[in-house]
Each structure stands twice: as structure tokens, then as C-alpha cells.
Amino acid sequence: PQPAERLDPSLPIRANELLIAVEALNLDSSSMRQIAESCGHDQARMQARIGDIVRSRGKMHNPVTGSGGVLIGRVAEIGAEFPDCDLKVGDVICTLVSLSLTPLALTGIGAIDVAASRVEASGHAILFASGLFAKLPADLPQQTAMALCDVAGAPGHVLKMAQPGQIVCVLGTGRAGLLSLCAARQAMGQSGTVIGL
């Protein structure tokens, strides 16, 4: 879905999908910066630009930066074949896969916090069975959850893919890169090589 120009966020969901009632988006910082600067930091223009992207692409995939972000929302429906049996309708989750590959339809865009890359929003998103997510505890503030989850997708994928004896090289040693290096070492144990550049 990521290289696709447009995704189909139409309902109903399929049996192996999860429907999320969107509460907020956390855009990739480069995407937020590009939108803010191109709109002169004007809230109304930024809201319109984000709405235009989502309407035209069926996902939040900034065509200039190529990046997305993550979202927080409540589980609205669980497909009969969705693989996680611990979820129930109403649970609050944060996606750990990019908005650039998450089918998304917005019905409203509220306040935008450029410094935090946060966009208050309403609508729905569809998470595929392969999509990673985190179920959020009730006592964890959403702002904190988004900051943590925004970089957690990459390490989650590394943890699933890295195997003992492999050579894993991570390009970029920012927050996501360092966490990915730790995940690789955890998955491989003491065998294999972990390289960070």
C-alpha cells in the first residue's frame, strides 16, 4: 500500500481488518514542517491541506516528503479473522505502521500542534492484519503515547524479522534507529552482527 498513489478507505471492513475511530494523528516531523511552512503556519490552510491529502490519496501520505506518521483511536470494529484476540471494541490503540500505508478517511480536522506534530482529527482508519499497533493503558496520556509509538514501528518490524546469525545494518541512528539496533540484538541474541551507521 505504501507505493500506491491512493488507498481505498471505504467500508465495510474485511474479515481480517480492524476499524479504528480516529482521535488524533501524529505526523512525521518532516511532513508537519513542510505542511506548516507551505501554509504559512495558518491553521485553516494547514487543516485544508491535510484534508486534501487524505481525500485525494485515501491515506496521510505527504506527496512532497513521502512520509506519514501514526494515529491514535478507538477500536470500532474487529473483523472475525483479525489475529489479535486481546482487543475489544472501545480499546484505545496507537498504530505502529505508517499513515502512508493505512487507509484513512477524515470527517473533521481540529487543532494542529506543529511543535508536537499532532493533529486532532475524526474519521476512520483501517488496519490490516499485518499492521502493528499498541494497546494503550488508560493512565498513559495520549501525547506521551504518540511520542513513544511514533518511533516504535521500525523496531517492532526488526524484532519480527531479525534472526540469529544474520548481519543487520541500520542506516540512521536517531531514536528509531537506536531502538531498531536494540531490537535486532534482542531478536538475534549474541549470534550475528549489528551495525549502526
What are these regions (language model features)?
Residues 177-178:
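N-terminal Rossmann-fold NAD(P) dinucleotide-binding loop
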Residues 1, 38-62, 106-131:
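Charged, glycine/proline-rich intrinsically disordered loops and linkers
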Residues 29-35, 104:
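Cytochrome P450 core scaffold surrounding the K-helix E-X-X-R motif
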Residues 19, 92, 166-167, 193:
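Residues that mark the start of a beta-strand
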Residues 170-173, 185-197:
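Adenosine-nucleotide cofactor-binding segment
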Residues 69, 94-167:
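NAD(P)H dinucleotide-binding glycine-rich loop of Rossmann-like/cofactor-binding domains
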Residues 2-9:
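Short glycine/threonine/proline-enriched tight-turn/helix- or strand-capping micro-motif at secondary-structure
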Residues 11-26, 37-100:
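Glycine-rich beta-strand-centered segment in the early N-terminal region that forms part
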